[in-house]
Swiss-Prot record:
It comes from Adiantum capillus-veneris. GO terms for cellular component: chloroplast; ribonucleoprotein complex; ribosome. SUPFAM superfamilies: Ribosomal proteins S24e, L23 and L15e (SSF54189). This is Large ribosomal subunit protein uL23c. Belongs to the universal ribosomal protein uL23 family. Part of the 50S ribosomal subunit.
């Protein structure tokens, strides 16, 4: 379970739980297909789609005064097919 760091809990992610979408913070090297295969095997569910984004933490400056953006983590929103849910989060309302 080292690919999945933790669940992201924000106002938006709680609203997405009602639409059967789960938000995770994952390893930076993890791809969408890798995440899909891992989620389907580990939780025994069917994944309909995945959205991913690389989240930035801070900006830095180099000697030549160019702005550099550091990537701190990757966030994935996993959308499951109907009648499937991840029992860990108990999102069924």
């Amino acid at each position: 379970m080292d690919k999945l760091k933790n669940q992201v809990i924000t106002g938006k992610s709680i609203r997405l739980l009602q639409q059967n979408q789960y938000t995770f913070q994952v390893d930076l090297k993890l791809t969408k297909t890798g995440m899909k295969d891992w989620i389907e095997r580990f939780f025994d569910v069917k994944v309909e789609g995945i959205n991913s984004s690389r989240m930035t933490s801070k900006n830095g400056k180099k000697k030549n005064k160019l702005n550099i953006t550091y990537v701190s983590y990757k966030k994935m929103i996993v959308r499951l097919k109907k009648n499937y849910f991840i029992p860990l989060f108990m999102s069924q309302t």
